Amino acid sequence: MAKYVGYKRPKDTKKTVKHLLTYLGHYKWAFLLIAILVFISAGAGIMGTFLIKPIVNNFIVPGNMKGLIIAVCGMGVMYACGALSTLGYNRLMVHTSQKVVSEIRMDLFKHTQKLPLKYFDNNTHGEIMSHFTNDVDTVQEAMNNSFAMVIQSFLTLFGTITMMLVLSVRLTIIVVVFLILMFIFIKYNGKRSKKYYHRQQKELGNINGFVQEMMAGQKVEKVFNHEQKNFEKFCEMNESFRKESTNALAYSGMLIPVIVSLSYFNYALSACVGGIFVIKGIMDLGSISAYLVYVRQSAMPLNQFTQQVNFILSALSGAERIFDMMDEAEEPDEGKVTLCNIIKNADNTITETSDKTGFFAWKLPAGELIELKGDVRFNDVVFGYVPEKRVLNKISLFAKPGQKIAFVGSTGAGKTTIVNLINRFYDIQSGTITYDGIDVMNIKKDDLRRSLAMVIQDTHLFTGTIADNIRYGKLDATDEEIREAAKIANADSFITRLPQGYDTMLTADGGNLSQGQRQLLAIARAAIAKPPVLILDEATSSIDTRTERLIENGMDAIMEGRTVFVIAHRLSTVRNSNAIMVLEKGEVIERGSHDELLEQKGRYYQLYTGQFELD
């Protein structure tokens, strides 16, 4: 079972905010309009409250009913403008935030496709998926609910304190002291909450990864009767998640009650002192009336902010994890040699063409063309998935154009590693791998892989029709080409027997097909690409003997003129290879044809006669 690596602690919140602002900057005019509407909304509330002073002093106390009605109507118009502005920025914020989050999600997916395989080796699928779901959703929710509210809260608080200073400096000192106490508590509580929210997200990633693995491995789980054991494991993980969630919510839940209590006490003290000021003639009745409303308004922005703290914390944590993944180094590609289509001239020269001729050449940076023939060589190659643990130890081998090379050996001998290195899924630590005399490090990875096709034992099919899955090897393939490729792989017969034939929809990973049928489709997908080099990584180990013979006959057609690498569990699949390489502990210990190796009576002979089992 894959081990959850875990989220890293936030390294630089400022960097995360700066990165987020880069995306917001793409919609600066929309956010500018939102800011203007927020300013109008906050300003309307502040100025509407200030009208209480003249209304009380000039109309209520003197008993001026006509003036009171006009003043109240003016206040109503001002509040209506504020309400319309609030409605406007909320609608605009929803539309804009959706665009921002959609752009982040697209960039994240695009970057994910460029990450090296070792990243996926070290991170569970559940953890990676949580970046696209949980983390992106928290950013979106915070933008919808918190962005405009935080700005409005700041403007309202700033404007309120300013107007309070205008009305009474001495009373405002009392309010500011309470606001400072509230701010200190919010900062302390936020720091503690953020730590627990981080742990909560880590535990959620654990659960996601575990559940995904269990769903993918249902058959294995049932065969070995691990249901109860896995349930107990899930209960442990669920309990850890519950504890961290409880701690996070406990701290965040303290905010509102404490802030509300402080605001009530602040209001009572301000009312008491303000009443004394009115009795002594220091303030008039209108001023204290407006002032007490401002006291309540000064607490509202902080209350609103505390309600959004949870969203802000989750959004920052989610954004940090998203941008951490986006900051992961992309798969390196320093290659400048490209692959191009060519025309073979009568005088044995070659010419580049934009037409798809089925003939290829390597185009060097200087413009020189080297015909692609499929000559692959390893020279003293050293490699290990972990640098200090070698998998291949100064291995040297070669495959001449058109040869079929087979690899046999026990688990961990390095068979699959060799084909991984041919594809440059990983880079070697020393030595060289050449392709038609060109170091593969100098070939652009996209072009290198375009010259290869690979069929692996754990066949992966995509949701879609059978035709779509075969066409994956050549996106512009015609229906006739698809059918021809299926015939080569001997898949046409079972496909045509299906009710909808080539238009049959496949469920997740081709679950409605047998293992053998899935492999036949994978072979058809490779056949339609017509690659110069073909890699069969244990491609026929799960297919019955009869189907295997049909595949071997069909594969002869696409192998002609191509270099083919084969890894198989069955020695019968490699007998007709030009060369068989026996691998042991990352080294080639025997090389030769089937008959030559039998004559040597070495490890291959022992495997063939059953003295050792072939893995």
Description of each model-found segment:
Residues 1-45, 60-71, 89-93, 97, ...:
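Membrane-integrated ABC transporters
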Residues 16, 24, 89, 93-97, ...:
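Juxtamembrane loop-to-helix connectors within ABC transporter transmembrane domains
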Residues 18-21, 29-50, 54, 71, ...:
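Alpha-helical segments in transporter systems
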Residues 26, 30-43, 74-84, 145-199, ...:
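Transmembrane helices of ABC transporter permease
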Residues 61-66, 70-71, 163-177, 247-320, ...:
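Helix-loop-helix
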Residues 108, 112, 221, 322, ...:
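Helix-loop junctions and hydrophobic alpha-helical segments within the transmembrane domains
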Residues 117-118, 134-143, 147, 151, ...:
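An intracellular "coupling" helix at the cytosolic face of ABC transporter transmembrane type-1 domains
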Residues 340-615:
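ABC-type nucleotide-binding domain
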